[in-house]
């Protein structure tokens, strides 16, 4: 679902029908940093949208489930998570930064991200020209804290050549 300004994604499925699981919502698919919001349900429903993401704060699970795929209309993008943090009101880092005016601004943003990271994969070296995905969900169904994952695109598959 692409953002249309409302919060319908919290309570509807892809078909617009009521759903306690909601639907992931993408902010601006053409920016350098796609921001995806999803519901943490926590109502005893397993594997629903982003409910399990908070478990990636465990280092073993972080490295085990570090790769994910984003399926778009005409392509599939492969991403690797390199950072996870939990945001509360005191977090001084603009994880919602969509584009960067210069390489210096980008590397400053990455340095700020490292400062607040619970886990940061030092094997990945994000570059100014890379594309990213930021995923945000609630820490749990009752908290105002947010789990933030930052991932870099490592590969893209087109639907035409079926290489995926």
Residue ranges and their predicted role:
Residues 1-164:
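Solvent-exposed, non-transmembrane regions of membrane-associated and secreted proteins
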């Amino acid at each position: 679902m692409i953002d249309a300004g409302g919060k319908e994604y919290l309570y509807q499925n892809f078909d617009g029908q009521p759903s306690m699981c909601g639907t992931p919502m993408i902010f601006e698919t053409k920016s350098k940093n796609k921001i995806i919001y999803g519901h943490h349900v926590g109502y005893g429903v397993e594997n629903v949208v982003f409910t399990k993401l908070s478990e990636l704060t465990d280092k073993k699970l972080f490295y085990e489930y570090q790769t994910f795929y984003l399926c778009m209309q005409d392509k599939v993008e492969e991403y690797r998570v390199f950072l996870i943090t939990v945001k509360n009101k005191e977090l001084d880092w603009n994880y919602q930064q969509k584009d960067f005016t210069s390489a210096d601004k980008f590397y400053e943003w990455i340095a700020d991200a490292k400062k607040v990271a619970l886990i940061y994969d030092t094997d990945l070296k994000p570059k100014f020209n890379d594309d990213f995905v930021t995923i945000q969900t609630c820490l749990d169904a009752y908290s105002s804290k947010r789990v933030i994952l930052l991932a870099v695109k490592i590969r893209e598959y087109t639907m035409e050549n079926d290489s995926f």
